[in-house]
UniProtKB/Swiss-Prot annotation:
This protein's record includes keyword Coiled coil: no
Similarity annotation: Belongs to the AP endonuclease 2 family.
Any GO MF annotation of the entry: zinc ion binding
Protein name (Swiss-Prot/TrEMBL): Probable endonuclease 4
Function field: Endonuclease IV plays a role in DNA repair. It cleaves phosphodiester bonds at apurinic or apyrimidinic (AP) sites, generating a 3'-hydroxyl group and a 5'-terminal sugar phosphate.
Length: 284
């Protein structure tokens, strides 16, 4: 079973995210549980929690179909201790909010060394940050997203993801989300079925499909290997349709949220319908 949706707005209340996902006939969705560009947010009220859970139940979204995303401000590998602590506290708050909402996943960008510490030290800090957050929360898996590698962002190599996972003590509560645009921009070819087979064979060898907890399905305005993060609508960018057809026909991507972050929300319903239509020839 493929769960397909988009990163929808939670404007006006978290329950609205589930409603908006249902309106585009999604079977999965992503959301921010707070303003993603602010450090602090008011605690979730009992009413907000109840309304969100009721909306998810009404529209048949289980926890495994929802992939919340944390704030863009958080840097779990920050080289400066004070800023690192601020990020860690904010991440624990994000995990706690997910726990309160009955959600089991939290997607996040791993972190940046800001040209101040070596890659290895930054990756170790990220793993330590995850360990701290997991120790203070229950039931929520930390889902590391691969990046395009802009600036000093880490996570653009599968080896980075593997190194972080290696440093996490509770392997049952860590996973990854692969963003197709980010992977392509980082130098992983996805332009044909053959290229996808090779890229995901590398992923299986280095990270392992057992850790795959979600996907972001985005075409790329950015060019191959450019390390530039620019999303595009499916089939309109430099990746093309073949990659997304291949994913929809491969059972290894079953049972996880497949989330659009493409640039035109007005055609999300069409993109979801197109993706669903590709399953007709699904192969085991």
């Amino acid at each position: 079973m493929k769960y397909v949706g988009a990163h929808v707005s939670a404007s006006g209340g978290l329950a609205n995210a589930a409603i908006r996902a249902a309106e585009i006939e999604a079977t999965a969705f992503a959301l921010f549980t707070k303003n993603q560009r602010q450090w602090r947010a008011a605690p979730l009220s009992d009413e907000t929690i109840a309304e969100f859970k009721a909306a998810c139940e009404k529209y048949h979204f289980g926890p495994g179909q929802i992939l919340p995303h944390d704030s863009y401000l958080i840097n779990l590998g920050h080289p400066v201790e004070e800023a690192l602590e601020k990020s860690r506290d904010a991440f624990i708050d994000e995990m706690t909010r997910c726990q309160q909402l009955g959600l089991t996943l939290l997607n996040f960008h791993p972190g940046s060394h800001l040209q101040q510490i070596p890659e290895e030290a930054c990756l170790a800090r990220i793993a330590e940050s995850i360990n701290i957050a997991l120790a203070k929360t229950e039931g929520v898996t930390a889902v590391i997203e691969n990046t395009a590698g802009q600036g000093s962002n880490l996570g653009f190599k599968f080896e980075h993801l593997a190194a972080i996972i290696d440093g996490v003590e509770d392997k049952s509560r860590v996973g990854v989300c692969i963003d197709t645009c980010h992977a392509f921009a980082a130098g992983y070819d996805l332009r044909s079925a053959e290229a996808c087979e090779k890229t995901f064979a590398d992923f299986e060898r280095i990270v392992g499909f057992q850790y795959l907890r979600g996907m972001h399905l985005n075409d790329a305005k950015s060019t191959f290997g450019s390390r530039v993060d620019r999303h595009h609508s499916l089939g309109e960018g430099n990746i093309g349709h073949d990659c997304f057809r291949w994913i929809m026909q491969d059972s290894r991507f079953n049972g996880i949220p497949l989330i659009l972050e493409t640039i035109n929300p007005d055609i999300w319903a069409e993109e979801i319908a197109w993706l669903r239509a590709q399953q007709i020839a699904e192969v085991a």
